[in-house]
């Protein structure tokens, strides 16, 4: 690197530091308005706040919960997505993550906790057992939590990795940003519009079937 003691002219044509250029402001009031005033729709601002401050309910059922908690460590840092504030009460949470096997005796408890959550609220089904019962096709295991509560995002895997949980959070944030719901109390039908999100399986189908790198049977 070449060093020089020549002073850089911030207003010169051959300026190497464009961020240091001094702008000539004709109207200081207009400059302050541009810096401090944001024009947009109220629904978009509310959804922006909701999707970036999701409070998950601290509730786990099985080994998938261990992977969920792993995402809160410094290696993954789920705080980047604003979902690191675990709540111990369903009345203070807006996201329930059903992580693990849902037994028949546990279904009424999950249903009651879900009913205690305030609107708006969302549900993530984490793991094969929560999605469809997994390997436990028996009388004591519910074959999917969507049998008694609505589910917004499904995470496949047994158990899924923490990266899959964070991807589910990003998909949920994308869905929340497109939601439309009343901003005040409404008697009767709330008129909530939820975006019809395409499944990851269908979205990546073209990439999945486009076989470009063929491996030999010995490498598979």
Curated annotation (Swiss-Prot):
Keywords: 4Fe-4S, Cell inner membrane, Cell membrane, Iron, Iron-sulfur, Membrane, Metal-binding, NAD, Quinone, Translocase, Transport, Ubiquinone
Manner of cofactor binding, per the entry note: Binds 1 [4Fe-4S] cluster.
Residues that hold [4Fe-4S] cluster according to the record: 63-64, 129, 158
Pfam families: Oxidored_q6
Catalytic activity, reaction form: a quinone + NADH + 5 H(+)(in) = a quinol + NAD(+) + 4 H(+)(out)
One Gene Ontology molecular-function label: 4 iron, 4 sulfur cluster binding
Top-rank taxon, per record: Bacteria
PROSITE patterns: COMPLEX1_20K
InterPro entries xref list: NADH_UbQ_OxRdtase-like_20kDa (IPR006137), NADH_UQ_OxRdtase_20Kd_su (IPR006138)
Top EC group: translocase
Function noted in UniProt: NDH-1 shuttles electrons from NADH, via FMN and iron-sulfur (Fe-S) centers, to quinones in the respiratory chain. The immediate electron acceptor for the enzyme in this species is believed to be ubiquinone. Couples the redox reaction to proton translocation (for every two electrons transferred, four hydrogen ions are translocated across the cytoplasmic membrane), and thus conserves the redox energy in a proton gradient.
PANTHER family membership: NADH DEHYDROGENASE, NADH DEHYDROGENASE [UBIQUINONE] IRON-SULFUR PROTEIN 7, MITOCHONDRIAL
The protein's assembly and partners: NDH-1 is composed of 13 different subunits. Subunits NuoB, CD, E, F, and G constitute the peripheral sector of the complex.
Listed name of the protein: NADH-quinone oxidoreductase subunit B
Species, as recorded: Shigella dysenteriae serotype 1 (strain Sd197)
Gene label: nuoB
């Amino acid at each position: 690197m070449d060093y020089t003691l020549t002073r850089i002219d911030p207003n010169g044509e051959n300026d190497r530091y464009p961020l240091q250029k001094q702008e000539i402001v004709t109207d200081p009031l207009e400059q302050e308005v541009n810096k401090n005033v944001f024009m947009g729709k109220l629904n978009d601002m509310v959804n922006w706040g909701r999707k970036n401050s999701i409070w998950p309910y601290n509730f786990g059922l099985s080994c998938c919960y261990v992977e969920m908690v792993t995402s809160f460590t410094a290696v993954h840092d789920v705080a980047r997505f604003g979902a690191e504030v675990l709540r111990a009460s369903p009345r203070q949470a807006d996201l329930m993550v059903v992580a693990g096997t849902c037994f028949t005796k546990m279904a009424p408890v999950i249903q009651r906790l879900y009913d205690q959550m305030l609107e708006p609220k969302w549900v993530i089904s984490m793991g094969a057992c929560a999605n469809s019962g997994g390997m436990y096709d028996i009388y004591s295991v519910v074959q999917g939590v969507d049998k008694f509560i609505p589910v917004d995002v499904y995470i496949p895997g047994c158990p899924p990795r923490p990266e899959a949980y964070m991807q589910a959070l990003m998909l949920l944030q994308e869905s929340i940003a497109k939601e439309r719901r009343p901003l005040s109390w409404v008697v009767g039908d709330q008129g909530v519009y939820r975006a019809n999100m395409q499944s990851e399986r269908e979205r990546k189908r073209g990439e999945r079937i486009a076989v470009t790198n063929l491996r030999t049977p010995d490498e598979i």
